[in-house]
Amino acid sequence: KIKVINMGPSAEGHPFLVTIISSEENINNLDKLQKINKMLTDPRGIEESLIAPLIEEGKAVVCQSMSLHASEVGGTQMTPELTHDLLTRTDSETQRILDNVIFVMVPCLNPDGQVMITDWYRETVGTDYEGLSMPWLYHKYSGHDNNRDGDYHNLVESKYMAQTIFVDWLPQAYIDHHHMGSTGARFFVPPYCDPIRPYADPLVWREISWYGAHIAYKLEEQGFKGILNAAQFAGWGHFGWHWITPFHNIAGMLTESAGVNYATPIYIQPEQLR
């Protein structure tokens, strides 16, 4: 049910991993399904009569990436549990996902930073510096601005990411998981607020709204509160991964979880929320 691909070394030599999770049958037929997905992504030259059978045989491709910003630790720290759930759960919903979706996951888009942040936290836990920002950049060349490299691909990690989502897999939907401040909403999901860039296909923006509404609905159905959408984060931003993907016909989405102090608990009083 899982395939792990080492795309190569990061800027400082750590492995950049891509994991693919789906049903056992889909994993065994991954090359064929990848070919079908590429044909449907760019159907020029394919006979019209072949399109419907390809759609019937193909699978949805969804990509998610975690912790591009290394201090936003929740994404990467969550991936082992998510992977375990998808591989071991036997309920009908999980099986439906595995049967119909090829899930392409980048468990850490900045492996160097993740190692730095982990080392920094372990060094400072129990001291006055516990939970404070690391006093150097968590990427050798770009620091926090690695999220501005979704178009030029200057960083080797960006090259691996572009290879994954623009060449190898071309997903129908993509989510880039981040953290925001601690005293606002608990979780942001699309749709973005206005303005949005007008140059992508309008249907992609509508798909983003549909995905985000479904995520919010499922969370609130389970009793989660503080879900925000259509506010705070506009659809007109720098060309990071979630904002450049709509121009590749991919429903690119950002999530922002309420911020944390690494593994140290934080306490938010009701009057602090705004």
Where are the model-predicted features located?
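Structured catalytic-domain cores with a bias toward divalent-metal coordination
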Residues: 1-274
